[in-house]
Curated annotation (Swiss-Prot):
InterPro entries assigned to the protein according to its UniProt record, in alphabetical order: Calcineurin-like_PHP_ApaH, Metallo-depent_PP-like, MPP_PAP, Purple_acid_Pase-like_N, Purple_acid_Pase_N, Purple_acid_PPase_C_dom
Assigned EC number: 3.1.3.2
Keyword Cytoplasm set for record: no
Glycosylation (residues): N53, N76, N126, N210, N313, N355, N409
Molecular function terms, GO-annotated: acid phosphatase activity; metal ion binding
Entry protein name: Acid phosphatase type 7
Residues that bind Zn(2+): D169, N204, H288, H338
Domain of life: Eukaryota
The family this protein is said to belong to: Belongs to the metallophosphoesterase superfamily. Purple acid phosphatase family.
Origin species: Danio rerio (Zebrafish)
Signal peptide range: 1-23
Cofactor: Fe cation; Zn(2+)
Chief location category: secreted
Length: 443
């Protein structure tokens, strides 16, 4: 009879025990890519995250300094299948937190009994119209060459911002490598977006598969999967919309373009009701592709006949542009990205400058002010400018960077541009003063 084999070494026994203990633990249940957003409902916050496997959707939270998990909320998850060759599956979880105390700070984590995230914190929206919120504004941020990311992370941690506005173009691109590029990007921005509401609009880099990655990964107010929506904060009504409906209509139809236009008109009409405009006098829009720019890349905004600005006459029926609509309803500030540069415009309408005065151009201007802030950093690097700026171009820079915005009160708004190339130096600033809002302000 053969001799019995020698006993396994202690290390192997330990490994076998560990494997046995974890053999039945599900793989891929850990929450990741956590981010929050305003749902457009007072005293609420929406928490979104993903997991590789299906799990329960739970957020445990409590007031900062109080009992850690005194509240619990449950939500739901939806399956998302990446359209790449691998058809990778992920689950997107959404949980709505309600009855939050305005302006109070909360600690939370998300997940389930199969795995919890680390601890995060946020401040509930201050519902007062006298609230003076601070924003970070940028577009065109990728997971490769994200020049502004580290500075935004630090400023988020020290409480500089109440809201982040990401004005289109994420990751470069969310769908690439069967969605893994999107996963990595969402993990990168978690250090910002899990703490401060991360509000978005779609850009041209989200176009693939009918914007499915953008629609699945982000959670914005309304029922259009974040393609267009509006919300209120402090003295402002903020409108997010898609410029891409003017460019991908052959792939996805004209219906979205006309539906969005009619929604925009109805939303602007409602915002301009006297009682609403008195309460929230500032109307701010955010869309990816600008109406105007002085870049040298032959983009839509470099042409007088910009599709976003004037519409398209090559469609049936013709598609209306947005400049006249925004002017008609007295939009104060229009935020754009797409160009990998920063450009501040003089108050402009119909390609003409309408400064408040030669000495104080941004005091009671007679047209909307446009800001292009698409230089946060991505693999496509910088864009360039034409040598001689247009008459409506007030300041421009090719530095990597982002924009800070402070809504001071009903009449004053402050904006500044931060250069990453110059180690956080403020390279441009503007105070917009509006003693009168609405279309009557243009007269």
């Amino acid at each position: 009879m053969a001799a019995a084999p020698p006993p396994p070494p202690p290390l192997l026994l330990l490994l076998l025990c560990v494997c046995a203990v974890f053999a039945d633990v599900p793989i891929g249940t850990q929450p990741e890519q956590v981010h929050i957003s305003y749902p457009g409902v007072q005293n609420s916050m929406l928490v979104t995250w993903s997991s590789a496997n299906k799990t329960d959707s739970v957020v445990e939270y409590g007031l900062w300094g109080g009992k850690l998990f005194s509240h619990s909320a449950t939500g739901n998850s939806s399956i998302f299948i990446n359209e790449g060759a691998e058809y990778r599956v992920m689950y997107i979880h959404r949980v709505l937190l309600t009855d939050l105390r305005p302006a109070a700070s909360y600690v939370y984590h998300c997940g389930s009994g199969a795995g919890w995230s680390e601890l995060f914190f946020f401040t509930a929206l201050n519902e007062s119209v006298f609230f003076s919120p601070g924003f970070a504004l940028f577009g065109d941020l990728g997971n490769e060459n994200p020049q502004s990311l580290s500075r935004l992370q630090k400023e988020t941690q020290i409480g500089t911002y109440d809201v982040i506005l990401h004005i289109g173009d994420f990751a470069y691109d969310l769908y690439e490598d069967n969605g893994r590029i999107g996963d990595e990007f969402m993990k990168q921005i978690q250090s910002i977006a899990a703490y401060v509401p991360y509000m978005t609009c779609p850009g041209n880099h989200e176009w693939a598969f009918n914007f499915s990655q953008y629609r699945a990964r982000f959670s914005m107010p309304g029922d259009t999967e974040g393609l267009w929506y509006s919300w209120n904060v402090g003295p402002a009504h903020i409108i997010s919309f898609s410029t891409e409906v003017y460019f991908y209509y052959l792939e996805y139809g004209l219906d979205l373009l006309f539906r969005q236009y009619e929604w925009l008109r109805a939303d602007l009409q409602e915002a301009n009701r006297p009682e609403n405009r008195a309460e929230r006098p500032w109307i701010i829009t955010m869309g990816h592709r600008p109406m105007y720019c002085s870049n040298d890349d032959d983009d839509d905004c470099t042409h007088f006949q910009s599709y976003v600005r004037l519409g398209r006459n090559d469609t049936k029926p013709p598609a209306p542009g947005l400049e006249e609509l925004f002017y008609q309803y007295g939009v104060d500030l229009e935020l754009w990205a797409h160009e990998h540069t920063y450009e501040r415009l003089w108050p402009v309408y119909d390609y003409k400058v309408f400064n408040g005065s030669s000495e104080e151009p941004y005091v009671n201007p007679k047209a909307p002010v446009h800001i292009i802030t698409g230089s946060a950093g991505c693999r496509e690097k910088h864009d360039g400018f034409i040598p001689k700026p247009r008459d409506w171009s007030a300041f421009r820079s090719t530095d990597y960077g982002y924009t800070r915005l402070q809504l001071i009160n009903n009449t004053h708004l402050y904006l500044e541009q931060v250069s990453d190339d110059q180690y956080g130096k403020v390279i441009d600033q503007m105070t917009l003063v509006k003693e009168k809002h609405g279309p009557d302000a243009w007269r």
